[in-house]
Amino acid sequence: MASEILVDHRQKALALLKLDADKILKLIQVQMDNLTMPQCPLYEEVLDTQMFGLSREIDFAVRLGLVDQHEGKKLLDKLERELSALHDAFTKK
């Protein structure tokens, strides 16, 4: 029973982290589409702040034993690749 609860908490933690990563991607996409260009200091500040916050969330979940360190790094790497692709698409417009 306890192991089932732990697995459930791990799944929920990873799902919440993925939701936060998706929110960051959407926030940056809206910002690029409507507000600022990637070279703008505001864009860079928002991106840096959001990525730092997510990395701290992941670190916290890893320290609690809810998320594997490799899985957390994978999530950050995936988000960075998606943001890079979004940036490339925007600059090619």
UniProtKB/Swiss-Prot annotation:
Q: Which Gene3D superfamilies match?
A: SO2669-like (1.10.287.750)
Q: Which InterPro entries match?
A: UPF0358 (IPR009983), UPF0358_sf (IPR036270)
The record ties this protein, via SUPFAM superfamilies, to: EF2458-like (SSF140404)
By its UniProt entry, which Pfam families does this protein fall under? Answer: DUF1507 (PF07408)
Q: Which domain of life is it from?
A: Bacteria
Protein family according to the UniProt entry:
Belongs to the UPF0358 family.
Known HAMAP family for this protein? UPF0358
Name assigned to this protein: UPF0358 protein BPUM_1375
